[in-house]
Swiss-Prot record:
Cofactor: pyridoxal 5'-phosphate
E.C. number(s) listed in UniProt: 5.4.3.8
Protein name: Glutamate-1-semialdehyde 2,1-aminomutase
Annotated Gene Ontology cellular component terms: cytoplasm
Family from the record: Belongs to the class-III pyridoxal-phosphate-dependent aminotransferase family. HemL subfamily.
GO biological process: protoporphyrinogen IX biosynthetic process
Species the sequence originates in: Solibacter usitatus (strain Ellin6076)
Length: 417
């Protein structure tokens, strides 16, 4: 497998774009080599500029649960393009998408559309502070909530991949409003609330972590978190940008039966286009401008193309609940075929092969992974036509377009990678 044209494009890119990429993990820094440049996608497969074909387990980092170029998504986009690309004014389709989200996600009574997961979490934090009149926020080590200044403390995703504990450019005063705690430890959460309970506005959490690899909650963890926040009058925010409509139609909150106060969404709800949303209890969301005093706005919020693609996606998933059964089956088959000496974490169609012998339940245990071994495995799989996330600390995704043949080829590739 050759990558001559990708290498040529990367040489051009590094002269014009920081690091040659528009999001750090794409640069392959942690796995070695240079990124492949994609020419097109179809179904469960990617095709690079050198003509190489890959079975895709990145799925644009989660949004493409139905695969690339799904006909219903394309048809919705074509209809939307005939009408216009952006209006900066309300449309009926925005209400339809809001209805679809509220219908599916148990805790959401009102919802505001934005343009990214980062915007969604940033806005949810502001709303939580405005609603409670408090300033501190609890987050968890290895969880990533977008590149919001105060949430880039001990964050996951690209910061974990590149080994950056805390980014430059965030004033200490911003970081001091964030309390980072170990994930899956109720004792640590209790201690934080005993010390600062009257100042904590919210706890924000990925209910299933995807940004230090896939790390599910231990039994009772989310239930305990819900009880603690209620006892102290703090809001519980589920960051379901990754898990929303992915681990279940109603997200992780449906899967685990826990209702947060606020929820952030993205990825799947845009059908592959840039989008985000935050929503929750009506008494909280009614404080958002212009209905209330907590300001948030966006020129392209509710963009008709993203709304059209997202609405088509959610309607398809609602009509076809068997999609989730298929995703569970494929995820289980892949997990069962993990290489020796590897710990597999999986929730539905999210999974990670952790190159460590021990269980991975938090950031400290994830950090013990042999990232060099993962890099070798990644490159071996890439050479065999399987495209995984280029980081030990990112989840992989099964999509509805993955065929039995795709799964079988992936399992066979893993035996020799």
């Amino acid at each position: 497998m050759t990558h001559t044209k990708s290498e040529e494009l990367f040489r051009r890119a590094v002269e014009k774009i920081p690091g040659g990429v528009n999001s750090p993990v794409r640069a392959f820094r942690s796995v070695g080599g240079q990124p492949v440049f994609i020419a097109r996608g179809q179904g469960s497969h990617l095709f690079d500029v050198d003509g190489n074909e890959y079975i895709d387990y990145v799925g644009s980092w989660g949004p493409l649960i139905l695969g690339h170029r799904h006909p219903e998504i394309l048809a919705a986009l074509e209809r939307a393009l005939e009408i216009g690309t952006s209006f900066g004014a309300p449309t009926e389709q925005e209400i339809d998408l809001a209805d679809a989200i509220i219908d599916a996600v148990p805790s959401v009574e009102m919802v505001r559309l934005v343009n990214s997961g980062t915007e969604a979490t940033m806005s949810a934090i502001r709303v939580a502070r405005g609603f409670t009149g408090r300033d501190l926020v609890v987050k968890f080590e290895g969880c990533y909530h977008g590149h919001v200044d105060s949430l880039l403390v001990k964050a996951g995703s690209g910061m974990a991949t590149l080994g950056i504990a805390d980014t430059q450019g965030v004033p200490k005063a911003f970081a001091d409003t964030t309390i980072p705690l170990p994930y899956n430890s109720l004792d640590a959460l209790e201690e934080a609330f005993r010390a600062h309970g009257d100042r904590i506005a919210a706890v924000i959490v990925e209910p299933v972590v995807g940004n230090m690899g896939c790390v599910p909650p231990l039994p009772g963890y989310l239930e305990g978190m819900r009880a603690i926040t209620e006892r102290y009058g703090a809001l519980l925010i589920f960051d379901e940008v990754m898990t929303g409509f992915r681990v279940a139609f109603g997200g992780a909150q449906q899967l685990y039966g826990i209702k947060p106060d606020l929820t952030t969404l993205g990825k799947v709800i845009g059908g592959g286009l840039p989008v985000g949303a935050y929503g929750g209890r009506k008494d909280i969301m009614s404080k958002v401008a212009p209905a209330g005093p907590i300001y948030q706005a966006g020129t392209l919020s509710g963009n008709p193309l993203a709304v059209a693609a997202g609405l088509a996606m959610l309607r398809h998933l609602k009509r076809n609940p068997q999609v989730y059964t298929r995703l569970e089956e494929c995820g289980a088959r892949l997990a069962a075929a993990a290489p020796k000496g590897v710990t597999v974490n999986r929730v539905g169609s999210m999974f990670t092969f952790f190159f460590t012998d021990g269980p991975v339940t938090d950031w400290e245990s994830a950090k013990r992974c042999d990232t060099s071994r993962f890099g070798e495995f990644f490159r071996g799989m890439l050479d065999r036509g399987v495209y995984l996330a280029p980081s030990q600390f990112e989840a992989a995704f099964v999509g509805a377009a993955h065929s039995d043949e795709d799964i079988a080829k992936t399992i066979e590739a893993a035996k020799t990678a």
